Amino acid sequence: MKKIIFTIGLSTLFLTSCSKTSVQSVQTNPTTQQQPFVWNAANVYFLLTDRFNNGNPKNDINYGRTAETAKLRGFEGGDFKGISQKIDEGYFSDLGINAIWMTPIVEQIHGFVDEGQGATYGFHGYWTKDWTSIDKNWGSEKEFQDLVDKAHAKGIRIMLDAVINHTGPVTNSDGVFPSDWV
């Protein structure tokens, strides 16, 4: 008797699960809600401005920086327009980035320095000459404002590295510290 009840139950289950009733599709209009920015959950992209993307080759050489440098020790052309192009293309959004940390953008020393690796310019942004001016190799104040506006429109924050402790190249005096300092 148990076998008969089990067989009838299984048959009923099988027959009802194979019905020809169609599933009705429901059209919904999803709403996008701006999520608050939370630094503890930020996905930060560290960006070396000069090395990222060259959006304007016309600003590649400024301040007479034409000396031949050691390999990868000179300016390579990355600039604000290049970063803006990548924001427009969705590069950062596709990676899930919501904050870009950029190397310093202030005007760098104009000449090169040899720290033992060959002629090197301040392409990295850490050899400040003028704290009140943007280095022309990276673009203008307007181009930087455009970059920030484009980033904000995509929910991306911009952070600038502020270097106050080591603002210039190594010198011969750097290793000479008074004995009571160490």
Residue ranges and their predicted role:
Residues 178-182:
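Active-site-adjacent "subsite" loops/lids of carbohydrate-active enzymes
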Residues 15-17:
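C-terminal motif of bacterial Sec signal peptides marking the signal peptidase cleavage site
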Residues 4-13:
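Sec-dependent N-terminal signal peptides
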Residues 1-4, 19:
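Positively charged n-region of N-terminal signal peptides that target proteins for export
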Residues 20-157, 165-167, 172-175:
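N-terminal structural segment of carbohydrate-active enzymes
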